[in-house]
Amino acid sequence: MATGDGTRAALTRRQIAAVVAGNGLEFYDFVTYSFFATQIGRALFPGDAAQSLLLSLATLGVGFVSRPLGGIVIGRMADRRGRKPAMILSFALMGIAIVGLALTPSYAAIGMAAPALAVLFRLLQGFSLGGEVGPNAAFLLEAAPPGRGGFYISLQFATADLAVLVAGLVGLALSSWLAPADLDAWGWRIAFLLGAMIVPFGLALRRTLVETLPAEEANAPAGGSVRPYLVIALAGMLMLGAATISNYTLSYLTTYAQTTLHMAVSTAFGATVVLGLVGVLGDLAGGWLADRYGCKRVLLGPWLLLLVLAVPAFLAMSAWRTPEALFGATAVLTLVHILGSTPAVLLFMQALPARIRAGGIGIVYALSIALFGGTTQLLETALIRWTGSPIAPAWYMTGAIAVGLAATLLIREPKRR
């Protein structure tokens, strides 16, 4: 990998795992909180069941608010002081936030201090996650051997999909083994603590990393103009927004199968398993193909297919309402989404110079998640109610992908090295 003094050193597999673990923990935390939102509401918030659940979900949402700030502060740190110290800071803050929430006393024990602490820890979690993505992605791109940048970046996304699977399995195991009262009292806390167990190991391994920010960039005077890259940032926002809407639409299929298609809970969770498995394979394939053929050439085909297939896939699910239709549509849509989204992110990253890469990625990613990730499922549920059409989410996803495709025209792909 390229180091700060221009030499090259190889990353070990454990070091790569330490870098991508942060992104995996992000998705593990999100899925775990979503899975146990009811139990968290009962434990930490006042009111009846409906009110406590609403407050619990609202607290999950506050984390989206602080993500852009984390992207700015920690991303700026990564571009000025180096990727390594920024990654150590963001991962440490993430561990504090997760353990803090897991150990927060109940509302019955400390009153309004419980929801206040929950909000504080979710804000800290969002801040750390906003600062985690940019430095990590920049590090992986800069550390990758020549011609392997796409594959290295794909590892970050594959880890996220793998974390979704692990979180689902942990949640199902705890809910199956524990009585409801135990799950409410302490069972949900175990799920968060299990995820936080990787933080000490990740921090220890991150301390062994070699800095990848070029020395001339780290020592350059602050305040260089970013104006020439505003168009690239806008294009990146639109592409990442399209990928985010598509991803959250596919994640919504578990809820969609239960509430709109009226399928069994076990069948609905099967869609999550399909999503995770296909996602991991698609991430790795998308990165490999981008290295071999170039980002634009790889992303155009899958995203054009997604434009064509989204509506028919939702029509098939709503018409047949069988596990085969649900799993088949999930697999096909996930594959074409992932094969296009991984190269799209890489295309944006490669267009940014090292001096603003971590901050640029972090801010654009955080804003995309805050604006689109936090609203997609709510909007799609509302669209189904307003239109009375079960395929409304497909049209929303199709429109987003069309905008993302148009945005690729604003970015010139650098020559592959």
Language model region names:
Residues 37-67:
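Extracellular/periplasmic helix-loop-helix junction of adjacent transmembrane segments
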Residues 151-172, 365-376:
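Glycine-rich segments within core transmembrane alpha-helices of 12-TM secondary carriers
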Residues 297-343:
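C-terminal transmembrane helical hairpin of 12-TM major facilitator-type secondary transporters
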Residues 355-386:
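A late C-terminal transmembrane helix in Major Facilitator Superfamily
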Residues 34, 230-278, 373-377:
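Extracytoplasmic gate region of multi-pass secondary transporters
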Residues 71-82, 283-295:
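Helix-to-loop junctions at the C-terminal end of transmembrane segments
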Residues 80-91, 292-304:
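Cytoplasmic membrane-interface "Motif A"-like loop-to-helix N-cap segments
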Residues 92-110, 305-320:
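C-terminal ends and interior cores of transmembrane alpha-helices
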